[in-house]
Amino acid sequence: MGIRLQSSDSMNNQHQTQQNKYFNVSNQASTRSLWSQQQQQQLLDTKGSASTSKSPMLMANNNVFSIGPYRQRKDAGRVSVLEKYEIIGYIAAGTYGKVYKAKAKETQEEQENSIHTHNQTLGSVSVAGIDGGMASREVENGGDDPLRLDGHGGIAVAPAAGGGLSSAAAHRARSNGAVKALPKKSAFTPFYAIKKFKTEREGVEQLHYTGISQSACREMSLCRELDNKHLTKLVEIFLERKSIYMVSEFAEHDLLQIIHFHSHPEKRLIAPRMLKSIMWQILDGVSYLHQNWILHRDLKPANIMVTVDGCVKIGDLGLARKFYNLVQTLYTGDKVVVTIWYRAPELLLGARHYSPAIDLWAVGCIFAELIGLRPIFKGEEAKMDSKKSVPFQGNQLQRILEVLGTPTHHTWPNIHKYPEYEQLSKFSKYRDNLSVWYHSSGGRDKAALSLLYSLLKYDPITRIDAIDALEHEYFTNNDPPVSSDVFEGLSYKYPPRRIHTSDNDIMNVGANKNKSGFNHHPPQQQTVNNNGVTNSSIGGLGVNRRILAAAAAAAAAVQVNGTNIVSGSSSSNGPIRKKKR
């Protein structure tokens, strides 16, 4: 009986196995049929699309390579510099461009927000008690000033339109000395300095756009990365009509203006505390640059700005560059750096490579000029010849020798390694007269003279650096102490920066906006040349349209001249005037 049951079980297993094989085979067959149907459908779709579509383009159209539509779309959405800023006047011009004073234009949304905020401020009062609590009450529309906490446990009062306080609580707060008047928003209008880089050469506009100068690229890239209290802060950059506009914070004064104020019409020395505060802030900014591996290479009084609140800021980074991990010498990139009166002696002797010590020499020259109110080394610059070779600045070196004396191998061990070392033998021997110059200029502080000697050392290796200069006795003796406001304690005010309103060529940007490609629908002008090819089709390949237009105009002028000569020979109106090409 057991044997029979076992055989029946085996028969059942065999039957189940046969069923599984059958189902697997059927599943595979159905999968193959579905796959074949999908392939056939894809082939039919491909044939149908091929029959309905156009023939493939063998050669791409010129518009494929043109960036014109992209540029037009970007230009249409770009905000103009004159749409965002109101130009007040022209400040000055430099080697690389012009600088203008401007202020930001308020948008409609900002005006509505300011009005809403002003109304909210006039409608509430917050009084802070001595125990730190605060009680709020509404003020009636009677000219009362709103009160609020000033963040230090006191009460801040905003002046109302009427002018005075009628609230008894506000009067008591003022009598206790715990009330501070809130400044009006209109009294602190932020101003900006807009630097427009030059795009013309000798006043004549170039036919072909040459691109962005190396100086502009360096200044923009460095200003984007740097962030220090004693460096002018970059706000934004505009690229408009192939011109670059750098918008920076505005400073009302500079050291050149301050020196001129103290030296004209009569000489009045700068206050000792102001002098020390200016020098400390300059060295703090230079220290920040050098710690970030950046050389300024153009430090001078005109590039040292002072804001209305007495903060010194280093500006004009047009010649600045990084000196970390250099591939070639610094001389290879820029053969002439630093204004001649502030140029270090190693540069005058033809150094092919130099260090941050050149900036410290320039700081020493600025320090001496603030003391004596005139440049300490005022030499005459030798101009370059037609071969563009860098001349030896002998007159400037002589001015340095007359004050600091002739350097020796003891004071400057590596002086014989400089290319222009042999030029020193042509000068007379001078002795050190810096202390004589210092006392004759009105200097009395021995620590200041010691710092001046450290900054004006001949040997760049032993010349003091910015970090050590900040720890010098001149700053640490606190007699007088250094102030974050260089104008603190002064009984007089410096005149504001002179602004010229007659020279505002930046205003032409807005006048010619529709002609410069910033309009939403620029007209498509096509000029046919002699070969029958339009400029628009050639322009798609990147050819300058202005060059093509100039060539077409020249060809038309030649044809006109030829007809005038033929017709003029038969007429008796007078001699023929030849037109200049």
UniProtKB/Swiss-Prot annotation:
Cofactor: Mg(2+)
UniProt keyword terms in alphabetical order: Activator, ATP-binding, Kinase, Magnesium, Metal-binding, Nucleotide-binding, Nucleus, Repressor, Serine/threonine-protein kinase, Transcription, Transcription regulation, Transferase
Compartments it resides in: Nucleus
Biased composition (Polar residues): 48-57
Residues covered by the Protein kinase domain: 85-475
Enzymatic reactions: L-seryl-[protein] + ATP = O-phospho-L-seryl-[protein] + ADP + H(+); L-threonyl-[protein] + ATP = O-phospho-L-threonyl-[protein] + ADP + H(+); [DNA-directed RNA polymerase] + ATP = phospho-[DNA-directed RNA polymerase] + ADP + H(+)
Biological process per Gene Ontology, one example term: protein destabilization
GO terms of molecular function: ATP binding; cyclin-dependent protein serine/threonine kinase activity; metal ion binding; protein serine kinase activity; RNA polymerase II CTD heptapeptide repeat kinase activity
GO cellular component terms given for this protein: CKM complex; mediator complex; nucleus
EC nos: 2.7.11.22, 2.7.11.23
Keyword Thylakoid assigned: no
Active site: residue positions: 298
UniProt superkingdom: Eukaryota
Region (Disordered): 34-57
Keyword Coiled coil set for record: no
Main location: nucleus
Binding residues annotated for ATP, in chain numbering: 91-99, 195
Subunit structure: Component of the SRB8-11 complex, a regulatory module of the Mediator complex.
Record family assignment: Belongs to the protein kinase superfamily. CMGC Ser/Thr protein kinase family. CDC2/CDKX subfamily.
Function summary: Component of the SRB8-11 complex. The SRB8-11 complex is a regulatory module of the Mediator complex which is itself involved in regulation of basal and activated RNA polymerase II-dependent transcription. The SRB8-11 complex may be involved in the transcriptional repression of a subset of genes regulated by Mediator. It may inhibit the association of the Mediator complex with RNA polymerase II to form the holoenzyme complex. The SRB8-11 complex phosphorylates the C-terminal domain (CTD) of the largest subunit of RNA polymerase II.
Protein name: Serine/threonine-protein kinase SSN3
Organism the protein comes from: Eremothecium gossypii (strain ATCC 10895 / CBS 109.51 / FGSC 9923 / NRRL Y-1056)
